[in-house]
Amino acid sequence: MVENVENNNFNLYERVYISLSRTVSNFECISEELKQETITEALKKSQVINEYVKYQGKLLPFHMFVFEVKKNLLSKNLEG
C-alpha cells in the first residue's frame, strides 16, 4: 500500500515537473534543487482525489495545482 502511494507521488511529481517545464519560461535556468524542493514541498501538502488534487484545503484540477506550484517556484526563484 505504501509502495503504491509512493509510486503515485512519483508519477505526480513527474507530471508536475513536465508541466512546469512547458509553462515556466527559462525553466532550465532555475536550479534543480529549487525545482525539486518546491515540487516535493507541494506534494507533501497535497492529496490526489480522483482527477483532482487537494492542496491547502482546496480541491483543484491538476492544471490549477501546477499553477500553484508554478507561483511558489517563481516566487522562491526571485527571492534566492
Regions found by a protein language model. Give the residues of each.
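A short, charge-rich alpha-helical start-of-domain segment used by transcription regulators
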Residues: 1-25, 29, 43, 58, ...
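Short, aromatic/basic-enriched loop-to-helix "N-cap" motif that marks the start
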Residues: 46-68
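Arg/Lys-rich amphipathic alpha helix in sigma70-family domain 2
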Residues: 67-80
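Enrichment for repetitive, rod-forming helical segments
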Residues: 22, 42-43, 51-52, 77-78
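Short amphipathic alpha-helix in the helical subdomain of ABC transporter nucleotide-binding domains
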Residues: 31-35
